[in-house]
Amino acid sequence: MGEAPISISSSPSKRGFIELCVRRTGHFTEVLHKMQCGDIVGLRGPFGRGFPFEDMKGHDILLVAGGLGIAPLRSLINNIHDERSEFGKVTIIYGSKNPSEVMFRQQFEMWRHRKDFDLYLTVDHPDDTWDGEVGLVTKPFEHLEIDAANTFGA
């Protein structure tokens, strides 16, 4: 079938399944999208270093992503959510080209309503329904106060 590097987007604290975020870009990813629950797929890895989750405990967290870059951070966000009392201030900044390309929209809405997560969504090209910030993913930094000495960033 093929192979491609794909990020796990589910929390490692959830057992018995994993969630992957895969954009359709060619034959291999098209085949993945057509798979049904219960189909078998081979996996290799994990590759990379992961996040220093245990070292992050007790600190503020700043997570910044654009587009598909939110997929691996979603895993970290969900893990932080599962152990929320272990962390200080949590700030999430996510940017997308336009509102229709905002990934995990329902989950962002849930995070937005939490009082213990600061969430900033921004798009480059808003439509009439957009009520978030407009501009590059760096736009929210104009008004954020970050304690650099006590903050882990990803």
Predicted segments — roles?
Residues 55-60, 64, 74-78:
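Acidic/glycine-rich phosphate/pyrophosphate-binding loops and surrounding catalytic core
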Residues 40-45:
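A short, hydrophobic beta-strand micro-motif
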Residues 70-84:
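Histidine-anchored nucleotide/phosphate-binding helix
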Residues 1-39, 96-98, 124-126:
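Ferredoxin-reductase
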Residues 93, 97-154:
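Reductase modules of NAD(P)H-dependent flavoproteins
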Residues 46-57:
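A short, basic/flexible loop-to-alpha-helix module at the beginning of a structural domain
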